[in-house]
Amino acid sequence: MKKNQVYNPFLPLYEYIPDGEPHVFGDRVYHYGSHDKEGGDTFCMLDYVCYSAPVEDLTNWRYEGVIYQAKQDPRYPAPQYMYAPDVVQGNDGRYYLYYCMGGDYGQGGYQGSVSVAVCDTPAGQYEYLGVVKNPDGSPMLKYICFDPAVLNDDGTIRLYYGTQYDYEERDDFLTNDFYLQDEMQMFGRSREEILSYPDSIMG
Protein backbone atom coordinates (compact mmCIF):
# COMPACT_ATOMS: atom_id res chain seq x y z
CA MET A 1 0.00 0.00 0.00
CA LYS A 2 1.36 3.41 -0.99
CA LYS A 3 1.65 5.83 1.92
CA ASN A 4 1.33 9.59 1.70
CA GLN A 5 3.91 12.04 2.97
CA VAL A 6 3.23 13.33 6.49
CA TYR A 7 3.53 17.10 6.80
CA ASN A 8 2.70 20.04 9.05
CA PRO A 9 0.23 21.34 9.83
CA PHE A 10 -1.55 18.00 10.06
CA LEU A 11 -4.75 19.54 11.46
CA PRO A 12 -7.08 21.97 9.66
CA LEU A 13 -5.86 25.57 9.67
CA TYR A 14 -8.85 26.68 11.73
CA GLU A 15 -7.89 24.38 14.63
CA TYR A 16 -5.56 25.56 17.37
CA ILE A 17 -4.64 22.63 19.63
CA PRO A 18 -1.34 23.42 21.36
CA ASP A 19 0.40 21.31 24.00
CA GLY A 20 -0.54 18.16 22.12
CA GLU A 21 -0.55 14.73 23.76
CA PRO A 22 -0.69 11.96 21.13
CA HIS A 23 -1.45 8.44 22.34
CA VAL A 24 -1.77 5.13 20.53
CA PHE A 25 -4.84 3.19 21.64
CA GLY A 26 -5.48 0.11 19.55
CA ASP A 27 -4.72 0.79 15.90
CA ARG A 28 -5.22 4.58 16.03
CA VAL A 29 -3.31 7.62 17.25
CA TYR A 30 -5.44 10.02 19.31
CA HIS A 31 -4.39 13.65 19.59
CA TYR A 32 -5.45 15.53 22.73
CA GLY A 33 -4.53 19.06 23.78
CA SER A 34 -5.74 22.43 24.94
CA HIS A 35 -8.02 24.31 22.54
CA ASP A 36 -7.40 27.93 21.64
CA LYS A 37 -9.94 30.26 20.07
CA GLU A 38 -8.93 32.23 17.01
CA GLY A 39 -8.91 35.89 18.01
CA GLY A 40 -9.59 34.93 21.62
CA ASP A 41 -8.78 37.09 24.63
CA THR A 42 -6.58 34.42 26.22
CA PHE A 43 -5.57 30.81 25.67
CA CYS A 44 -7.51 27.60 26.32
CA MET A 45 -10.94 29.19 25.81
CA LEU A 46 -12.61 26.30 23.97
CA ASP A 47 -13.75 22.84 25.02
CA TYR A 48 -11.61 19.77 24.37
CA VAL A 49 -11.81 18.16 20.96
CA CYS A 50 -9.99 15.10 19.66
CA TYR A 51 -8.54 14.05 16.33
CA SER A 52 -7.41 10.55 15.45
CA ALA A 53 -5.62 8.78 12.61
CA PRO A 54 -4.70 5.19 11.75
CA VAL A 55 -1.27 4.26 13.09
CA GLU A 56 -0.31 3.23 9.56
CA ASP A 57 -1.47 6.47 7.90
CA LEU A 58 -0.75 9.69 9.78
CA THR A 59 -2.03 11.77 6.87
CA ASN A 60 -5.62 10.65 7.40
CA TRP A 61 -6.81 12.56 10.49
CA ARG A 62 -10.44 12.34 11.56
CA TYR A 63 -12.30 14.86 13.72
CA GLU A 64 -13.80 12.97 16.66
CA GLY A 65 -15.77 15.93 18.00
CA VAL A 66 -16.01 17.60 21.39
CA ILE A 67 -15.05 15.07 24.05
CA TYR A 68 -15.35 17.23 27.19
CA GLN A 69 -16.79 20.64 28.08
CA ALA A 70 -15.54 23.02 30.76
CA LYS A 71 -19.06 23.46 32.10
CA GLN A 72 -19.10 19.78 33.10
CA ASP A 73 -16.72 20.57 35.96
CA PRO A 74 -19.05 21.48 38.86
CA ARG A 75 -16.41 23.04 41.09
CA TYR A 76 -15.22 25.96 39.03
CA PRO A 77 -17.05 29.25 38.38
CA ALA A 78 -16.91 31.24 35.17
CA PRO A 79 -14.80 32.00 33.26
CA GLN A 80 -14.24 28.31 32.65
CA TYR A 81 -11.16 27.47 30.64
CA MET A 82 -9.19 24.23 30.68
CA TYR A 83 -5.43 23.95 30.38
CA ALA A 84 -3.82 21.17 28.35
CA PRO A 85 -5.08 17.68 29.31
CA ASP A 86 -3.75 14.17 29.05
CA VAL A 87 -5.46 10.79 28.72
CA VAL A 88 -4.43 7.39 30.03
CA GLN A 89 -6.02 3.96 29.80
CA GLY A 90 -6.67 2.70 33.31
CA ASN A 91 -6.21 -0.81 34.60
CA ASP A 92 -9.98 -1.29 34.23
CA GLY A 93 -9.77 -0.66 30.47
CA ARG A 94 -11.52 2.72 30.63
CA TYR A 95 -9.95 6.02 29.61
CA TYR A 96 -9.21 8.79 32.08
CA LEU A 97 -8.80 12.43 31.09
CA TYR A 98 -6.75 14.52 33.53
CA TYR A 99 -6.97 18.31 33.33
CA CYS A 100 -6.71 21.56 35.28
CA MET A 101 -9.15 24.43 35.10
CA GLY A 102 -7.79 27.86 34.20
CA GLY A 103 -9.14 31.34 33.70
CA ASP A 104 -8.27 34.94 32.99
CA TYR A 105 -5.31 36.21 34.97
CA GLY A 106 -6.49 37.14 38.45
CA GLN A 107 -9.97 35.66 38.02
CA GLY A 108 -11.48 32.49 39.39
CA GLY A 109 -8.77 31.92 41.99
CA TYR A 110 -5.46 30.16 41.57
CA GLN A 111 -5.73 27.39 44.15
CA GLY A 112 -6.73 24.51 41.91
CA SER A 113 -6.62 20.75 41.68
CA VAL A 114 -6.14 18.18 38.95
CA SER A 115 -9.57 17.01 37.80
CA VAL A 116 -10.48 13.69 36.21
CA ALA A 117 -13.12 12.65 33.68
CA VAL A 118 -13.75 9.12 32.40
CA CYS A 119 -14.99 7.44 29.22
CA ASP A 120 -15.33 3.91 27.88
CA THR A 121 -13.63 4.84 24.59
CA PRO A 122 -10.62 7.06 23.75
CA ALA A 123 -12.64 9.72 21.93
CA GLY A 124 -16.16 9.40 23.30
CA GLN A 125 -18.07 11.68 25.66
CA TYR A 126 -16.07 11.97 28.88
CA GLU A 127 -17.95 12.43 32.15
CA TYR A 128 -16.69 14.28 35.21
CA LEU A 129 -15.38 11.86 37.84
CA GLY A 130 -13.72 13.96 40.54
CA VAL A 131 -10.37 15.39 41.59
CA VAL A 132 -7.00 13.91 42.43
CA LYS A 133 -6.77 13.54 46.21
CA ASN A 134 -4.09 13.39 48.86
CA PRO A 135 -3.63 10.14 50.86
CA ASP A 136 -5.88 11.57 53.58
CA GLY A 137 -8.73 12.01 51.09
CA SER A 138 -8.52 15.80 50.81
CA PRO A 139 -8.30 17.44 47.35
CA MET A 140 -4.72 17.94 46.17
CA LEU A 141 -4.63 21.73 45.77
CA LYS A 142 -1.70 23.49 44.12
CA TYR A 143 -1.10 27.10 43.19
CA ILE A 144 -1.66 27.52 39.43
CA CYS A 145 -1.75 23.83 38.65
CA PHE A 146 -1.63 23.13 34.90
CA ASP A 147 -0.90 20.71 32.04
CA PRO A 148 -0.94 17.29 33.75
CA ALA A 149 0.84 14.37 32.09
CA VAL A 150 -0.15 10.85 33.04
CA LEU A 151 1.03 7.36 32.10
CA ASN A 152 0.27 3.78 33.00
CA ASP A 153 3.60 2.36 34.13
CA ASP A 154 2.92 -1.38 34.10
CA GLY A 155 -0.19 -0.97 36.22
CA THR A 156 0.91 2.04 38.26
CA ILE A 157 -0.68 5.33 37.19
CA ARG A 158 1.91 8.12 37.38
CA LEU A 159 0.83 11.77 37.32
CA TYR A 160 3.04 14.77 36.58
CA TYR A 161 1.90 18.38 36.39
CA GLY A 162 3.13 21.94 36.08
CA THR A 163 2.75 24.54 38.77
CA GLN A 164 3.92 27.97 39.84
CA TYR A 165 4.74 29.11 43.34
CA ASP A 166 2.49 31.88 44.57
CA TYR A 167 5.43 33.77 46.00
CA GLU A 168 6.64 34.56 42.48
CA GLU A 169 3.78 37.07 42.36
CA ARG A 170 4.73 38.76 45.63
CA ASP A 171 6.42 42.15 45.86
CA ASP A 172 9.28 40.82 47.99
CA PHE A 173 10.07 37.85 45.75
CA LEU A 174 13.52 39.13 44.74
CA THR A 175 14.52 40.12 48.28
CA ASN A 176 13.21 37.20 50.33
CA ASP A 177 16.02 34.71 50.96
CA PHE A 178 13.66 31.75 51.47
CA TYR A 179 12.06 32.26 48.06
CA LEU A 180 15.42 32.75 46.36
CA GLN A 181 16.91 29.62 47.90
CA ASP A 182 13.89 27.63 46.72
CA GLU A 183 14.26 28.91 43.15
CA MET A 184 18.02 28.29 43.17
CA GLN A 185 17.52 24.69 44.21
CA MET A 186 14.61 24.04 41.85
CA PHE A 187 16.27 25.45 38.72
CA GLY A 188 19.93 24.81 39.55
CA ARG A 189 20.79 28.49 39.15
CA SER A 190 22.89 30.88 41.19
CA ARG A 191 21.47 33.80 43.14
CA GLU A 192 22.88 36.16 40.53
CA GLU A 193 21.18 34.27 37.70
CA ILE A 194 17.83 34.33 39.49
CA LEU A 195 18.12 38.05 40.19
CA SER A 196 19.02 38.79 36.58
CA TYR A 197 15.44 38.03 35.55
CA PRO A 198 13.05 40.95 36.09
CA ASP A 199 10.09 38.79 37.12
CA SER A 200 11.20 35.22 37.75
CA ILE A 201 13.43 32.51 36.38
CA MET A 202 10.47 31.46 34.23
CA GLY A 203 10.75 34.70 32.22
Residue ranges and their predicted role:
Residues 1-203:
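Carbohydrate-active catalytic/glycan-binding domains of CAZyme proteins
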